[in-house]
């Protein structure tokens, strides 16, 4: 069995919801699509049948993947966390030393990261640089554009909305 990994309780619920949907809705729909395509006769030249079989393979692979993820997840209720230093689950406000603009990041598990929502994976370069830091600390992060420097302004632990 592979190692456990952290995930927020909201992130875990989202994965479980997707898993249930795949098992109880998509799996049934794909089976119906295959049966309907079979009814059209010759399977060797049946594009609908091939498409349905491909979708079935995708759905089954995704179910297996999600079952593996949920079995290895270490669920963390971020709202119950606290502390003065940055760790998994923190919502961090930083000041970019160059532009003096505020940026905010939520440090989450790898399966719930979404940069468009400012959620960064615990394994990302920015999160790795931030872990263990406190308010007032200066953090240097290697980015594709070079080294960026930030000052930690606030650290909070609160539930995220997914």
Curated annotation (Swiss-Prot):
Keyword Transcription: yes
One Gene Ontology MF term: RNA polymerase binding
Pfam families: GreA_GreB, GreA_GreB_N
Coiled coil: 44-69
Biological process (GO), any one: DNA-templated transcription elongation
Keywords of this entry: Coiled coil, DNA-binding, Transcription, Transcription regulation
Regions crossing the membrane: none
Keyword set includes Transcription regulation: yes
Function in brief: Necessary for efficient RNA polymerase transcription elongation past template-encoded arresting sites. The arresting sites in DNA have the property of trapping a certain fraction of elongating RNA polymerases that pass through, resulting in locked ternary complexes. Cleavage of the nascent transcript by cleavage factors such as GreA or GreB allows the resumption of elongation from the new 3'terminus. GreA releases sequences of 2 to 3 nucleotides.
UniProt xrefs under NCBIfam families: greA, PRK00226.1-2, PRK00226.1-4, PRK00226.1-5
Entry similarity comment: Belongs to the GreA/GreB family.
Name the UniProt record assigns to this protein: Transcription elongation factor GreA
Gene that specifies this protein: greA
